[in-house]
Amino acid sequence: MAQFFKAKPNSSKQLSAKLSLNVDQLDHLGAGIAQYQGKVVFIPGALPDETVTVQLTEQKKNYARAKLIKVDAQSPERVEPECPHYHTCGGCDLQHMSLSGQREHKEAALLDIMAKFAGTEGGALSPALTGEGWHYRRRARLATLFDKNTKHLSLGFRAASSSNVVPISQCQVLAKPLSDLIVPFAKLLNQLSAKASLGHLELIAADNGHFAVLRITKALNDKDLAKLSAFAEQHQIYICLQDNEGQFQGVGVELVLPVYQLLDENAQSDAVSLSFTPGNFVQVNSQINKAMVAQAMDWLAPAPDERILDLFCGMGNFSLPLAKMGADVIGVEGVAEMVSQARVNAKANNLDKLTFYHGDLSADLSLEPWMGKIDKLLLDPARAGAFESLQWLKKMKPRKVLYVSCNPASLARDSAVLLERGYRLQRLGLIDMFPQTHHIEAMALFELTK
């Protein structure tokens, strides 16, 4: 049988060619979407209603990716990024879009994902929780990179989809006092004899001061410790070192733990605060976290002596305020160190209607001592969601379920489970925890109807 040669398209020519495309919408990760030869093309940095010149960087069967070369016709939502490092640093990806445009996109994306995967189309969103668009982060981890040839240590954030460190002089989303410390810290670290043995630097702005956590891979000598101590005194900041075993040591002073306020003091109640060990997870946006906690209390409406289960409770971000309102609270967390700190926080706030447990929430929960009938359930899982935990709804039978999500995809999947079990979505709202980025957080309230 004769075989005929069929020439394949020259993919290298296709990738090098420049194209003019019209952008229709944004995907859930904030990239522009256009159409080309029957394929969807994803274009980071492009906005809806723009005409752009791009260069294809990847071709697949059903989609392609492209690099933005030039914006030929701008969207009215396009703005000039405020950060000089925006186009190289991997921290933010929506600074080129107005803040109102970002929020409108995030709300539309949230509704779209919930409609597609949870069948909740047609619902209205509650007002979004929004705050400052700049200098909102009270915590950030800066990467270090030591160049063996130049003997220079770079301090900054990693580039998008890369391990390369982009040196930065400022960060427009980091709290201003912390941003102002980046250049002085970079200079200090390069003066240390152990600069080749330094890991990341974490900066924290807490209600009881500013903190820096420096990761070290070997012990520092006395001269280096003296330089760190003098820097801490000059800049009025607590510095602590974290070694390979995860142990912390204060520099020049005893180790002090950062403290965040969860509920402000008012006429009816004292303030509720949370202390934590550097390295443990806490919400980085103080303004939005306070609003989120207040909204959770409003939506869940805890009553005195109600039995409320807080799964993925961390160090008590929601458990402490729930107990403050008189509920009998059970908090369960998968990280043992955070459970210990949650107990410390309960004692510090004089809250005794709280019990914390350590447990794997993806495992069989049937024999757990806390498993049983509850009045209400609060979920605040990591990005993977709470699918396994929701398989035990029949044993818990909560009247209300409040779900705080950092991943709308897992929220939609888990919402489908709740709807199948007789719950109805009562409220849904955006939490804009991370302005200038595509990240979407949300809060959903479900009530049992069957």
Swiss-Prot record:
A single MF term (Gene Ontology): 4 iron, 4 sulfur cluster binding
Assigned keywords, A-Z: 4Fe-4S, Iron, Iron-sulfur, Metal-binding, Methyltransferase, rRNA processing, S-adenosyl-L-methionine, Transferase
Domain of life: Bacteria
Single GO BP term: rRNA base methylation
Active site feature: 406 (nucleophile)
Binding site residues for [4Fe-4S] cluster: 83, 89, 92, 171
Pfam families assigned to the protein according to its UniProt record, in alphabetical order: TRAM (PF01938), tRNA_U5-meth_tr (PF05958)
Enzyme class: transferase
EC number of the protein: 2.1.1.190
Presence of keyword Zinc-finger: no
Keyword presence, rRNA processing: yes
TRAM domain residues: 12-70
InterPro entries per record: 23S_rRNA_MeTrfase_RlmD, MeTrfase_TrmA_AS, MeTrfase_TrmA_CS, NA-bd_OB-fold, SAM-dependent_MTases_sf, TRAM_dom, U5_MeTrfase_fam
UniProt binding sites for S-adenosyl-L-methionine: 283, 312, 317, 333, 360, 380
Catalytic activity as recorded in UniProt: uridine(1939) in 23S rRNA + S-adenosyl-L-methionine = 5-methyluridine(1939) in 23S rRNA + S-adenosyl-L-homocysteine + H(+)
HAMAP family reported for this sequence: 23SrRNA_methyltr_RlmD (MF_01010)
Family assignment from sequence similarity: Belongs to the class I-like SAM-binding methyltransferase superfamily. RNA M5U methyltransferase family. RlmD subfamily.
Function comment: Catalyzes the formation of 5-methyl-uridine at position 1939 (m5U1939) in 23S rRNA.
Descriptive protein name: 23S rRNA (uracil(1939)-C(5))-methyltransferase RlmD
Organism of provenance: Shewanella sp. (strain W3-18-1)
Organism classification: Bacteria, Pseudomonadati, Pseudomonadota, Gammaproteobacteria, Alteromonadales
